[in-house]
Amino acid sequence: MTDVAVIGFAEAPNERRSPATTNGVEMLVPIFGEVLAATGLSKDDVGFWCSGSSDYLAGRAFSFVSAVDAIGAFPPVMESHVEMDGAWALYEAWLKILAGEAEIALAYGFGKSSAGTLRRVLALQLDPYLIAPLWPDSVAIAALQARLGIEAGAWSEQDMAAVAARSSSSAITNSRALVSPPDSVAELLDRPYVADPLRAHDCAPVTDGAAVVILAGGDRARALCERPAWITGFEHRIDSGSLGTRDLTTAPSAGDAGRAAGAARAQVAELHAPFTHQELILCRALDLGDEVSVNPSGGALCGNPMFAAGLARIGWAASAVMSGRAEVTLGHATSGPALQQNLVCVLEARP
């Protein structure tokens, strides 16, 4: 079985309202060029392309087909798509290399979240029989989750504000993030609720954006990248889709995926947590101690483009290895309501 590594990553600037169309082409073309130039590759070198996006954001069926224009319609390429975050497209690309069907693969995710009312669009992923007809929006569900944790003594509003303050401070060095001036915990707690107990800083901003990651196998990875980020564990698990049948203050699927992937050795963890309390849940589920640097990029709280933010977390985790800032890192992505489905990718450097 071939070893597989991340050799390139690029992310479009996170924007609250991009002038780009919903097919993502305007966001993808620049970052395709950026990542291919950085790795010394051309489009012809890529043996497999896989995208992650959603027709629900674009408002039309098979909307991802238009995004292929960013690759180029001719000559034909081997291409696939997942109606998921681009992190799951990366998983498919990883399997393609492991199966020996490609040496180099490129995964990308994109989403124009501002095209509709995102918190209502996400209600369409709920149980269609009992929950979705009530139209509880994504922020309201997250607020219920946060309140359950507070009442159970698992965390406090102060803990949540501390996550927001740290994320804002970390994002200052990330030129692609939506950066707000960092405030103190006390200042954040003095702000009004948007959905009790959530304040604006507890919620990831509605974001338009895209991300791309290039994988290569074995000797090709070593030849193309001075310090590849080798994938040593890649797992995803899912909890019940029924909100009433699981403990929303925990994320068992994240813990299971982390243990299977070997998350315990991570020095840096990039977690896809769209709400402050969800970062706290994930840190507990993945058993991340205080010695682990969590979301040094600022995380999803400083830019959460739908269907690209999870892939970007893996990209930032890989960047920490490729730059020499860490030996072992963890990238995480989530999907579904209240951390229902979770994916963990562990990356490390090798001599």
Label each PLM-derived region with a short phrase.
Residues 105-153:
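Flexible glycine-/small-residue-enriched beta->alpha junction loops
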Residues 42-48, 158, 264-267, 290-291:
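Short acidic capping loops at alpha-helix termini that bridge into adjacent secondary structure
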Residues 185-191:
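Short, conserved active-site entrance elements at the starts or edges of catalytic domains
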Residues 113-117, 169-174, 338-339:
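Short, well-ordered, mixed-charge alpha-helical segments that flank or form enzyme active sites
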Residues 22-25, 29-30, 53-106, 110-111, ...:
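Claisen-condensing/thiolase-fold acyl-transfer catalytic domains that form or cleave C-C bonds
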Residues 3-19:
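Generic N-terminal amphipathic, Lys/Arg-enriched alpha-helix
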Residues 2-5, 47, 101-102:
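Loop/turn elements at helix/coil->beta-strand transitions in domains of secreted/extracellular proteins
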Residues 136-184:
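N-terminal leader/propeptide and maturation segments of large enzyme subunits in energy/redox metabolism
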